[in-house]
Design a protein with these regions (language model features):
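Non-heme di-metal
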Residues: 1-286
Length: 286
């Protein structure tokens, strides 16, 4: 797949009507676990693109550029809303959290196997041990509070096992800063991986920031609060890997390229025919 060689949709077709805007949620008892993680991943990717676009727009005085950013951003917002509403109302926040941590473990491990930059691989390997711990602790909390086994939610695809103990996760903020990519032309896979994992971990961080206060018991609130602080460290670590000398426009191009790659990847691997159609539609938009 090379989005630079594919004919794009006309920009007038980027917006969808209200009927197409509304989507039926997946069935939480039947959904493939990786369908859930794909939805979480792309939700976070769209969130990152929307807020990057907002920050870009606020930092430039070119009104024509700001209009184009606003135009694309509305489409990104529609995509994000569609993805958000694929989650069913009867899937609890804790069940959904298991999906977040399954994504963290499997995505981090997958990217670590594919990157070329040893510094990026080291960052991924380091955080992976903490992602395993987070999945294990949330699974334990799910079993304790509801009797539900997280192994069913992850479909047996992801091992639920202790990782680095959470007490060892808390570090001084300075220690979360890694060396950024400084090569003039870093490997495309390295650029993609660093941007993908930053957006994914940022989505997890934001989810925990807003979920912690929902829990009626102190144990749950403390759990989300503590792991949420670790996610801040992960986002700081991954964000520090990004190439700092890129212009805003270059970064905008990378953000759009990341979306193309991920939507294509989701389409290629999706097993749910209806959801696969959504990935195809959004890939064509990108």
């Amino acid at each position: 797949m090379n989005p630079f060689k594919m004919r794009p949709e006309r920009t007038g077709d980027l917006f969808v009507d209200w009927e197409k805007f509304w989507v039926k949620p997946y069935n939480k008892n039947e959904v493939n676990p990786y369908t859930r993680t794909r939805i979480i991943l792309m939700n976070g990717t769209e969130f990152e693109n929307v807020w990057f676009s907002h920050q870009f727009s606020r930092s430039v005085g070119d009104d024509e550029l700001r209009r184009k950013l606003a135009y694309i951003r509305k489409s990104e917002q529609q995509q994000q809303k569609i993805l958000t509403h694929l989650k069913p109302a009867d899937e609890s926040a804790l069940e959904h959290t298991i999906g977040y941590e399954q994504l963290a473990v499997d995505l981090t491990a997958h990217l670590a196997k594919r990157v070329n930059d040893k510094n990026i691989k080291s960052a991924l390997d380091f955080a992976l041990l903490e992602d395993f711990d987070h999945l294990y602790r949330y699974a334990d909390y799910l079993d304790f509070t509801t009797g539900e086994h997280a192994e069913k939610l992850v479909g047996g695809y992801t091992e639920i096992t202790p990782g680095r103990p959470t007490i060892s996760h808390h570090r001084h903020p300075y220690d979360s800063i890694r060396y950024p990519m400084t090569d003039k032309c870093p490997a495309t896979m390295d650029v993609l991986a660093a941007n993908v994992i930053t957006a994914a971990e940022q989505q997890t961080m934001n989810y925990y920031m807003n979920t912690a206060a929902l829990w009626p018991d102190e144990m749950g609130r403390r759990l989300y609060q503590e792991i949420g602080m670790v996610e801040e460290q992960h986002v700081t670590q991954y964000g520090s890997l990004l190439k700092p000398c890129m212009s805003r426009l270059e970064n905008l191009l990378v953000h759009q390229y990341v979306e193309c790659w991920l939507y294509w990847s989701c389409y290629e691997t999706e097993t749910d025919t209806r959801i696969r159609g959504i990935w195809q539609f959004m890939f064509e938009q990108e």
